[in-house]
Amino acid sequence: MVALNTLSAVSAALLVLAASPSPASARSLDASPSSAFSGNHSLSKRSLFDPACTGIYDRQLLGKLGRLCDDCYNVFREPKVATGCRSNCYYNLIFLDCLEYLIPSHLQEEHMEALQTVGK
């Protein structure tokens, strides 16, 4: 009986939460998730895109390359790694060193293909 009362209380609490208006539902449908955190400042979809990259804009590939640089920075904690890895559209020695250090050799070709696609 105690378990049933607890279950009923939890169910009632969930119903109240589901029925109450939330700040997220008050946002317009065309608002981006980033605008919720930045106030009136809206981010462009390509705001993190390096204009030096003259290849194909592929958000997924750029994210993969960017995560490699983030991981490398997290390992070494050197500011020059964070900025240098992304410089020249990832076509630099720091990026190659990070690739060699963090990615197993049999998976490095995948990152090099991504570099060729988005790069110079």
UniProtKB/Swiss-Prot annotation:
Keyword line: Amidation, Carbohydrate metabolism, Cleavage on pair of basic residues, Disulfide bond, Glucose metabolism, Hormone, Neuropeptide, Secreted, Signal
Main subcellular localisation: secreted
Signal peptide range: 1-26
Subcellular location, record wording: Secreted
InterPro entries from the UniProt entry: Crust_neurhormone_CS (IPR018251), Crust_neurohorm (IPR031098), Crust_neurohorm_sf (IPR035957), Hyperglycemic (IPR001166), Hyperglycemic1 (IPR000346)
Record PTM Valine amide, positions in chain: V118
Cystine crosslinks: C53-C89, C69-C85, C72-C98
One Gene Ontology cellular component: extracellular region
A Pfam family annotated for this UniProt entry: Crust_neurohorm
GO biological process: circadian rhythm; glucose metabolic process; neuropeptide signaling pathway
GO molecular function, one term: neuropeptide hormone activity
Family membership noted in the UniProt record: Belongs to the arthropod CHH/MIH/GIH/VIH hormone family.
Summary of the function given for this chain in its UniProt record: Hormone found in the sinus gland of isopods and decapods which controls the blood sugar level. Has a secretagogue action over the amylase released from the midgut gland. May act as a stress hormone and may be involved in the control of molting and reproduction.
Protein name, as recorded: Crustacean hyperglycemic hormones 4
